[in-house]
């Protein structure tokens, strides 16, 4: 996993070439959204707990999953769910800043689906909560930054599905 800049430079370096027009355009696009990504990350970092709390309220709180017999019924399981969702939000933010979703493969998704299945964690409910995080985040950071952040949250959802 590497950031967008390193990926472009390494590609040219492996070929022993200077950056071509296409590579420079990729860098230009990355830098042109830099301020937007940093502003979004600042807002997300300052509001992470509230984002996760609101996303859980929107997607999971009043469903069967939190009632007796449900997978999130017990404080310990509920806390584990909150912890996982916070982790996904944090790593999606890192990936957004880097401009590269492959960070998520290595740090989040490798073996996660298998682990969830072996522990009986409902993947569908998790994906639903991640989509709620996407919605809450977009309402907080604005449409353009929300769309950018959504790329990385969708990447996690797809990796779990």
UniProtKB/Swiss-Prot annotation:
GO cellular component terms given for this protein: phycobilisome; plasma membrane-derived thylakoid membrane
PTM text: Contains one covalently linked phycocyanobilin chromophore.
Role, per record: Light-harvesting photosynthetic bile pigment-protein from the phycobiliprotein complex. Allophycocyanin has a maximum absorption at approximately 650 nanometers.
N4-methylasparagine modifications at: 71
Highest taxon above the source species: Bacteria
Keywords of the record: Antenna complex, Bile pigment, Chromophore, Electron transport, Membrane, Methylation, Photosynthesis, Phycobilisome, Thylakoid, Transport
Subcellular location, principal: membrane
Family indicated by similarity: Belongs to the phycobiliprotein family.
Subcellular location: Cellular thylakoid membrane
GO terms for biological process, alphabetical: photosynthesis
Chain's gene name: apcB
UniProt-recorded name of the protein: Allophycocyanin beta chain
Membrane topology listed for this record: Peripheral membrane protein
Subunit structure: Heterodimer of an alpha and a beta chain.
InterPro entries noted in UniProt: Allophycocyanin_b, Globin-like_sf, Phycobilisome_asu/bsu, Phycobilisome_asu/bsu_sf
Alphabetical list of Pfam families matching this protein: Phycobilisome
Binding site for (2R,3E)-phycocyanobilin: 81
